Amino acid sequence: MASGSGDSVTRRSVASQFFTQEEGPGIDGMTTSERVVDLLNQAALITNDSKITVLKQVQELIINKDPTLLDNFLDEIIAFQADKSIEVRKFVIGFIEEACKRDIELLLKLIANLNMLLRDENVNVVKKAILTMTQLYKVALQWMVKSRVISELQEACWDMVSAMAGDIILLLDSDNDGIRTHAIKFVEGLIVTLSPRMADSEIPRRQEHDISLDRIPRDHPYIQYNVLWEEGKAALEQLLKFMVHPAISSINLTTALGSLANIARQRPMFMSEVIQAYETLHANLPPTLAKSQVSSVRKNLKLHLLSVLKHPASLEFQAQITTLLVDLGTPQAEIARNMPSSKDTRKRPRDDSDSTLKKMKLEPNLGEDDEDKDLEPGPSGTSKASAQISGQSDTDITAEFLQPLLTPDNVANLVLISMVYLPEAMPASFQAIYTPVESAGTEAQIKHLARLMATQMTAAGLGPGVEQTKQCKEEPKEEKVVKTESVLIKRRLSAQGQAISVVGSLSSMSPLEEEAPQAKRRPEPIIPVTQPRLAGAGGRKKIFRLSDVLKPLTDAQVEAMKLGAVKRILRAEKAVACSGAAQVRIKILASLVTQFNSGLKAEVLSFILEDVRARLDLAFAWLYQEYNAYLAAGASGSLDKYEDCLIRLLSGLQEKPDQKDGIFTKVVLEAPLITESALEVVRKYCEDESRTYLGMSTLRDLIFKRPSRQFQYLHVLLDLSSHEKDKVRSQALLFIKRMYEKEQLREYVEKFALNYLQLLVHPNPPSVLFGADKDTEVAAPWTEETVKQCLYLYLALLPQNHKLIHELAAVYTEAIADIKRTVLRVIEQPIRGMGMNSPELLLLVENCPKGAETLVTRCLHSLTDKVPPSPELVKRVRDLYHKRLPDVRFLIPVLNGLEKKEVIQALPKLIKLNPIVVKEVFNRLLGTQHGEGNSALSPLNPGELLIALHNIDSVKCDMKSIIKATNLCFAERNVYTSEVLAVVMQQLMEQSPLPMLLMRTVIQSLTMYPRLGGFVMNILSRLIMKQVWKYPKVWEGFIKCCQRTKPQSFQVILQLPPQQLGAVFDKCPELREPLLAHVRSFTPHQQAHIPNSIMTILEASGKQEPEAKEAPAGPLEEDDLEPLTLAPAPAPRPPQDLIGLRLAQEKALKRQLEEEQKLKPGGVGAPSSSSPSPSPSARPGPPPSEEAMDFREEGPECETPGIFISMDDDSGLTEAALLDSSLEGPLPKETAAGGLTLKEERSPQTLAPVGEDAMKTPSPAAEDAREPEAKGNS
């Protein structure tokens, strides 16, 4: 390198040395061009740090001294981008920046190289590329704006610039701190560039001539104002999100704070967002920061707030900024010094750039799109106007909500609650940032506290602000996404639609070409064809000729040399990559391997598979070279070599254990042609359960990106929908359901599904259901698995296309029984997916095909299993039942939607069905399908259902079925409680004629709930009044009930007429002795009320027993005896009442009073001195008002006989105790002071309605409560 001699020359800079030499006589008389050639040759040979010095001299020569040489030597300098030296690669980036600034047209050639360097593996190279892009983005935008006619190359160049800007924004998430810092500065510049300058924007002196959004005309043919404005706002949003990330580092946070301050000063329209971001950060400092870092961040935040406060546009936000500064410990005097004066605000001059912009603006386009106008921001408006447009933020809304709630009481409560969670010692981080609260309790301090709390709540996703924003943005968000996507389509087109270029391709001549229409050509990086050794002044040497030394070789030598040459080229991978000739090497290898034998191909394939990711370019080059050879051969060409290459690659990739990066998919999608054999490899890849999703994603992309053969690829995916492996099949069905939504594929998918469904009408499974390797000549029977194979796809599509249900019904009618059973088992879930309001499903119910009744019924059951039937569904089923198919099974699913009358009419038919079906019917009516009973939706409540069963005509249904049905009711103990059964018995007893199963129900109820004993006694007494003996079956049950309930039933038996009493003894003679003993335990006064005819029957076979004392009173005639009912326990009894019970009479009051008058003249029944005669005044008070029965309290288990007399005081406790013992009832807690009086009764004309007598009956719950006492007394 000629650098001159002497100290004076050595001390000069590289550039000054060079220019001095050039201005002088020159070294060896070299021209500038020759000098450049010489320096480049030196740089190619130098390996130490002096290479940078030489390259910088070249840069000075061709950029500053003689720019005409720039284009000539561009490729040679760019070749150094593959140099292993980091500094050299950084120099190349700097050279690209300077060259493009000198001649912007060079950006067309160099942008792809810069894009490659942006992805360099070295961090410092990437950082240098980001810094260069910060400048070149503005330069490129200005160039595009000035160009009124945009070429295709310019469009592609700008697309790549925009894509690189997007990539740099993504580097905000890089793992390297330095890269993130550089990305923040790039985003800052991007936001400033893609937003308009305003009247009060602060413009740094070095950026005065930089382009901004306001300099871009609205009618530019390619650059769209609105798109750039949206990109600028999106970049700001990304920066704000990055700043509030909880894991942000200290250096990144400091850089972001400065960038936001710069943005606020240069673009005041973003002042609101910046202040809010500062507030959020102040309230939520990242927890990962150390104590010293917290102090540093707070100091930076304070400095930037003060710088923003100086700006005139900060007037609107002075309250928020001041509060933040006070919290950060800023003195009021310092805040006052940094306040903008109102004079500056009023008299702030307009920037020169604004006036220049006015001159530059073109005439407005009268045909401008209204939609674009709506999106245009007002560049000349103030920050206040922009704030009004943007509306309140989440924090503002939440702060307004909290401010009135921050009363002294509420704040005191919050402090007290939070003290529970305070640590024992003050954290160091809190101590470092704590500043005393000034002006506590003032309106300003309360407002600040509300904003602090609102900021934290918003960061946590809480508060009314977040909720309102979500609601307001739901619909606009969808529209915004659509618009943004349409805006970005043009930019991303090249990236998505780029085709892999074929080396030496003749694809434009091939009719078999499958690729999509050619996308916009992207800029390609410069790759020098030869090594940087250039022919210059010293390059004139004798040309080496191969023919001079060529000697004939044997075939074996030739083969060995070929193999050796290929191996050497393969092994030279790293060396070639450092020299920048990697692409040349790939082309050589692809050409060699295509022309030679399979031995070389196996060697190259093995080399590729060793590191597929790094050598994928070689794989594609080889693949496309084979395809190009096939095309070049024309009509006589064969695909065998291409197919062999593709299958080898795919098979090798399939054997690789880890395919997470999707290389297999990339090879399939970018292969020029997918042959049948290759498609079979893809299919096997899909059948691998560990790679199912990736394989089917590949198939999906083939279907959508290669429309010429999409149905062939779709067929493979459809075949997989009936695969025997669950995971493979499920994944295929998911993909197919998404494709079914596409109109162009819908018909094919549907036809395939219906073809498989139609296979079910065959007597045996067709061979298509079996693999090709299985023998299907012998007819195999249908199995559940083969039936399901035909149904999987159809059932997956059914919820999306309800019309398909009619096809299933048609097939079902023709299928064999085994197939029908499987269909019924698998149809449930898809039918539920259709829903009972599906018009097609309702139509199927309405027009139920003959033979599909079971299918329709199953559908109805599936629909109504957990939800009540809809009115429309009930109407269709009702019409079907009444007009076409009177099969009561149709009604079962919609029972809860029918009228009560309809259910009662259908009951005789329903209970004659299979017991399992009957159980289902009762589960629906009682609401017990899923556990606890809930008949709220049933047309019949439990009581009405049981009554309806009793009322079924035995002609319509046999008694055995009715009894089984009632047993099902009694089995539901949770539903048929004692209260329900009491109401049922009361209503059945009131019916005329009495139901045949009445007494059976009474006995079952008493067995289930023994505490109903008292109530049952009342029922039996009422049945005597209804002359139960006239109903033979009921009478037989009556006697059995009396037999089972003795001795409680003795009081009822005594009410029977003599003839019927004798009949009872005839059927149950064992009742006579206990009943006689019971009567003899009465006092004489009580026995006086027993008619002689009754006593005669009682004593008919008991003459040997001592006769009871006759009552002095005259005997009652049989006709005078009226059946009496149990009376409820009276109001508090007199203390001397030894029996503790009262008489309740159901007949006329007048006749009862007459009986009392007959008994009064007798000696025994006459009152004694201590027993006053009964009188109206001595009677208990009127009975309590009739209320609903309450069985929650236990009552006495038995009652006294319906006929009894008063007793004297001195009768003694022993006799009374004996009477209680015989009745198994409790000893009364209080006895009457005088004789027992009779309760007034209503006349027959005012008998209580149905159920009222039950209300008078003692509570069964009360009986159970007093049972222990009764047992103790007995």
Curated annotation (Swiss-Prot):
UniProt note on tissues of expression: In testis, expressed in polar epithelia and Sertoli cells but not in vascular endothelia. The protein is detected in stomach, duodenum, pancreas, liver, fetal brain, carcinomas, lens-forming cells, fibroblasts, lymphocytes, lymphoma cells, erythroleukemia cells but not in endothelium of vessels, epidermis, intercalated disks, Purkinje fiber cells of the heart and lymph node.
Q: What is its main location?
A: cytoplasm
One annotated Gene Ontology cellular component of this protein:
plasma membrane
Residues bearing Phosphothreonine?
Answer: 1257
The compartments listed are:
Cytoplasm, Cytoskeleton; Cell junction, Tight junction; Cell membrane; Cell junction
Crosslink (Glycyl lysine isopeptide (Lys-Gly) (interchain with G-Cter in SUMO1)) position: 361, 1239
Positions annotated as HEAT repeat: 31-64, 67-101, 104-146, 153-192, 227-266
Q: Quaternary arrangement and interactors, per the entry? A: Found in a heat-sensitive complex at least composed of several cleavage and polyadenylation specific and cleavage stimulation factors. Interacts with CPSF2, CPSF3 and CSTF2. Interacts (via N-terminus) with HSF1; this interaction is direct and occurs upon heat shock. Interacts with SSU72.
* Name of the protein: Symplekin
Organism, per UniProt? Homo sapiens
Question: Where is the organism placed in the taxonomic lineage, from the top?
Answer: Eukaryota, Metazoa, Chordata, Craniata, Vertebrata
* Gene this protein is translated from: SYMPK
